[in-house]
Amino acid sequence: GRARGKNPNMGSNDERENTLNQLLTEMDGFETNSGVIILAATNRADILDSALLRAGRFDRQIYVDLPELKDREDIFKVHVKPLKLAEDVDISFLAKQTPGFSGADIANVANEAALIAARKDKNAVEKQDFLDAIDRIVGGLENRNKVIKVNEKKTIAYHEAGHATVSWLLQHAHPLLKVTIVPRGKALGAAWYLPQERQITTKEQLLDQMCSVLGGRAAEELTFGQISTGAQNDLEKATKQAYAMVTIFGMSEKIGNLSYYDSSGQSDFSFTKPYSEKTAELIDSEVKELVENAYTQAKALLKQHQEQHKQVAELLLEREV
């Protein structure tokens, strides 16, 4: 049901288009009194062909969003019913720890917590088992046996402490949940946040989030006078967010209130940008300025609170958590 392209070079009689045309024909061919109701589901409604959504076809749409706090509580109650829970398990607390989780994710948390408790020969599933299960699903399997050199471990500790310190000091950054230097999956360390479930996000909130993301690299440069490849994922996040701010949300003074986001799904068939080369250069310049400003702010905050940053890093190294 993907939207048909307007590019003449794509060919108008490919199999996908034939299938779509046949589907449209079949939907138009039912008798009005036949009592046939057609249901369909997709997670990419934005790229469906407009002919599918016209009156008499898929003309009623129900948007099913990810569960919110109360919904997650109810889903948790369903999935923990078969489990024997310890007294310290608080369902509302678990719901608060899992923003952005789908129903399947929550079922996975309950199953994983039960497995963790069983491995430790416990009589009941405890609160810590659920927290360990959430960590495993979010960050991957813990790998304490991974060989990491002393100087590398120190770099990781100061990097993660940088994220923690900067996000703690920023008004609009997501609240810090946990920071670790224990390798999980491909990550050598991680700082996890508890995103607030907002319906809209302001420019100040986005800038603070970007500053928090760059706190790790800023900490490396300030502490050791050099930078490493450990910030690759952070840089990717910051760059994507900056491009979104400039090209989608119209948050750049020089570009103005323009959005180059194509919600029709037609852009996949087009090889041209909807703006000139001069504008492309201006976008790149604005993105670079946003990222550099956030990085400068992160360094300034860490320089100002150097002692606290050091305390967090040394605590991570000491306890190896």
Which residue ranges define each predicted feature?
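Conserved C-terminal "switch" segment of AAA+ ATPases
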Residues: 31-37, 50-51, 64-131, 136, ...
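Soluble catalytic regions of large protease machineries
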Residues: 151, 155-158, 164-321
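Residue-level signature of catalytic and energy-coupling elements of molecular machines
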Residues: 23, 42, 58, 72, ...
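Flexible beta-alpha connector loops of hexameric P-loop NTPases
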Residues: 1-18, 61-69, 83, 100, ...
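Conserved catalytic/switch belt of AAA+ P-loop NTPases
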Residues: 1-60
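Alpha-helical membrane and juxtamembrane elements of multi-pass inner-membrane transport
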Residues: 14-21, 46, 92, 204, ...
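Generic recognition of well-ordered alpha-helical segments
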Residues: 22-25, 74, 78, 96, ...
